[in-house]
Amino acid sequence: MSSQAKVLLVNGPNLNLLGRREPGHYGHHTLEQIVSDLQQQAADANLQLEHIQSNAEHLLIEAIHNTDADFVIINPAAFTHTSVALRDALLGVAIPFIEVHLSNVHSREPFRHHSYFSDKAVGIICGLGAQGYQFALQSVIAQLKASQQK
């Protein structure tokens, strides 16, 4: 990529507890480890990565409203199943996004099967643990390169 593109990484409620919260579902990586790995992957691709994690929906919405990112990677966590407001924020800024989930939401409780985001996402990655974030960023890098070649 010729100029430095920007990606906003959004992590929703309770993801600050990664590494100690239900490791059978979410793995042993902490959020700090995941973000650090992504920062390195982004730097290697000459990409700027901004990150926000919050348990407060309005802070995530404000971060999306205020970003000048070219792409969003979002793990809405529990907001996946409840937040029309967060969905509307993404649609309002019209920035493409990839939805990521550490666990396979479709093999869990029925209420986790519905997402307010999936029908608008460029792609969805679930059930691959922390590696899912890396795959999402790989996809973003490829899509940004392809858009610059047009």
Curated annotation (Swiss-Prot):
Query: Which residues make up the annotated site Transition state stabilizer?
Result: 21
Q: Which InterPro entries match?
A: DHquinase_II, DHquinase_II_CS, DHquinase_II_sf
**What EC number(s) is this enzyme filed under?**
4.2.1.10
Which top EC class is named for this enzyme in its record? lyase
Instruction: Report any one BP term from Gene Ontology.
Output: aromatic amino acid family biosynthetic process
Q: Which reaction does it catalyse?
A: 3-dehydroquinate = 3-dehydroshikimate + H2O
Question: Which pathway is recorded for this entry?
Answer: Metabolic intermediate biosynthesis; chorismate biosynthesis; chorismate from D-erythrose 4-phosphate and phosphoenolpyruvate: step 3/7
- Where is substrate bound in this sequence? 75, 81, 88, 102-103, 112
Keywords linked to the UniProt accession: Amino-acid biosynthesis, Aromatic amino acid biosynthesis, Lyase
Q: Which GO terms describe its molecular function?
A: 3-dehydroquinate dehydratase activity
Give the top-rank taxon of the lineage listed in the UniProt record for this protein: Bacteria
Functional description taken from the UniProt entry: Catalyzes a trans-dehydration via an enolate intermediate.
UniProt similarity note? Belongs to the type-II 3-dehydroquinase family.
Q: Please identify the protein, giving its name as recorded.
A: 3-dehydroquinate dehydratase
